[in-house]
Amino acid sequence: MAVDDYEELLKYYELHETIGTGGFAKVKLASHLTTGEKVAIKIMDKESLGDDLPRVKTEIDAMKNLSHQHVCRLYHVIETPNKIFMVLEYCPGGELFDYIIAKDRLTEDEARVFFRQIVSAVAYIHSQGYAHRDLKPENLLIDEDQNLKLIDFGLCAKPKGGLDYHLMTCCGSPAYAAPELIQGKAYIGSEADIWSMGVLMYALMCGYLPFDDDNVMVLYKKIMRGKYEIPKWLSPGSVLLLSQMLQVDPKKRISVKHLLSHPWLMQGYSCPVEWQSKYPLGYVDEDCVTELSVFYKCSRTSTSRLISEWNYDHITASYLLLHSKKSHGKPVRLKRPLAVGDQPVTSFKELRPKSTLDFEEPNCGEIAYVFGSMEFSDDELFSEDFAYSCFEPHTPKEYVKGRSEFHSVDSAPSTPVVQRYARHKSEDKENCDAALGKDENVFLHPAPWTPTPRRKQNEKKGILTTPNKNSHTKEKNQSKETPTKKPITTGEELANVISPERRCRSVELDLNQAHVDSAQKKKGAKVFGSLERGLDKMITMLTPSKRKGYAREGPRKLRAHYNVTTTNIMNPEQLLNQIVKVLPSKNVDYVQKGYTLKCKTQSDFGKVTMQFELEVCQLSKSEMVGIRRQRLKGDAWVYKRLVEDILSSCKV
């Protein structure tokens, strides 16, 4: 875990705070130096990935080949001896799930807006030969303009046999899985996605799942029966659409093609859902080419040719981010970075990668790596090395809508499935190579490293330390800190607590566990916590504008987003004390640092079942005090119920 791993990355990006983290990956907010645009950088450790390393190919290949207004955009891929960096579109609005929590449930008009965007994204990926196979609110991010972006393609499948190819792998989240998957039958990926979309639509409009139970086998029986409650507030049109998607027999389910112009989705709209991409990969913008050629002192012809190679190197990233600026109405201009010790880049020649990204041909059966399902180590979450973060939302707007027709999606039934537990060595028979004609090399194996012992954990659980309210620090310094364990989310107000009868929870287990012996389950990913924390500190020192010795003494000022609950309490210390008093009664352990409480729950056997953060904050445009809530690990619906219970007990 040498700093050398970050050398290439730091040529082009300034790293900010950690906004998501896990056992083998973390996500950092960053700024692209030449455009100034914000990006999210997913940092994966090869050693921690282990046998899942080849499965990174599934995620990266899919994102290289998918370019759509409702799919999260990949900008840049960097490989070093120990790390893989994926530079992605930054979506500050957080998970769609947070929006559901804030609203309790969505009105049909709100749900229709979001669901049209979901249908658009899914229809597009099906038309490209992919099935997502892990559709759920946690895998949909909201941008600054309330538009959705589909993420997490680690379980996607592109069958070698085409869209009619039947799949066998059982994967995804149990509560969203189609009956044919949990029965272990061969299935068509696109049909399974339609079922998941039905569950997702129900969750949007009801605020809870149609099929849910503590016991996974009971949950499976409910799914296979296909019977669910129909709340009185649902309109006849929405009830009909749900029944058409949640058909136990996949052949009776509505197709994506018919979804595009379904009467419920057309209500209030003059045209069917627009599924085609607004920015196909073949298109190169002339204004962006001109700016890049002038900036790097290269001919327009050479610049256009380099962009058209779509190598997902810094050239690709610079072009895509510059084009994003143009779509926002911003000036199409690049700025020359002058980082300490860096020489300005003067030509594209200097930007060409020293080596291309290498992939390893999958030889580990049907193992799948899910980027969005990060596991957290207790040492990392409850460590002494805790910092705060503050950032301003900023994300590209959606392109202007245009009319389009859908041609062949309903003939795109199948998509592959990849198991997390299978460890036998065999070819990946379901996924065809998404990057035809591109490098067929393999990921380089990680270089040997010498482990460094962890530092002692001196934090004590459940100890309240009232922050010093007399000291103040400038807001601009907060955004330069490099904190840990805070995924992207935003939110407004928590309202309309779910009724007591909604107490059953979704089971966040591998679907595979129903069909496989426990000896086949893979071991937990290793976490190099102390090494990562030390590296974060080194990066903080090396990155310009980082300030040593920064400490926050008062509550942060935040915008009233979807994951911030407003309260009627004006004193932040009083609110903090109320939360601390309530947590033990809910069997929640916590570690406090300033105004943030890092919380976790455990099973009777000591296994961590839930990890989340509660932070007392000041709302930036008022004198009101709020609570920022953030799920880090565990079932999303159990988290929703628990946080609502805590806030209700605090009487905020």
From Swiss-Prot:
Keyword Cell division in annotation: no
GO biological process: apoptotic process; cell population proliferation; erythrocyte development; hemopoiesis; neural precursor cell proliferation; positive regulation of apoptotic process; protein autophosphorylation; regulation of heart contraction
Cellular component terms (Gene Ontology): cell cortex; plasma membrane
Region annotation (Disordered) ranges: 443-492
Domain Protein kinase: residue ranges: 13-265
Positions of the UniProt region annotated as UBA-like: 284-323
Pfam family, one: UBA_MELK
Modified residues (Phosphothreonine): T169, T415, T450, T452, T482, T484
GO molecular function (one): protein serine kinase activity
Modification note: Autophosphorylated: autophosphorylation of the T-loop at Thr-169 and Ser-173 is required for activation. Phosphorylated by the maturation promoting factor (MPF), composed of cdk1 and a cyclin-B. Also phosphorylated by some MAPK. Phosphorylated during oocyte maturation. Dephosphorylation destabilizes the protein. Degraded when cells exit mitosis.
Autoinhibitory region: annotated segments: 328-652
Regulation of its function: Activated by autophosphorylation of the T-loop at Thr-169 and Ser-173: in contrast to other members of the SNF1 subfamily, phosphorylation at Thr-169 is not mediated by STK11/LKB1 but via autophosphorylation instead.
Segment forming the signal sequence: none
Function: Serine/threonine-protein kinase involved in various processes such as cell cycle regulation, self-renewal of stem cells, apoptosis and splicing regulation. Also plays a role in primitive hematopoiesis, possibly by affecting the expression of genes critical for hematopoiesis. Plays a role in cytokinesis during early development.
Domain notes from UniProt: The KA1 domain mediates binding to phospholipids and targeting to membranes.
Record-stated family: Belongs to the protein kinase superfamily. CAMK Ser/Thr protein kinase family. SNF1 subfamily.
Designated name of the protein: Maternal embryonic leucine zipper kinase
Record organism: Xenopus tropicalis (Western clawed frog)
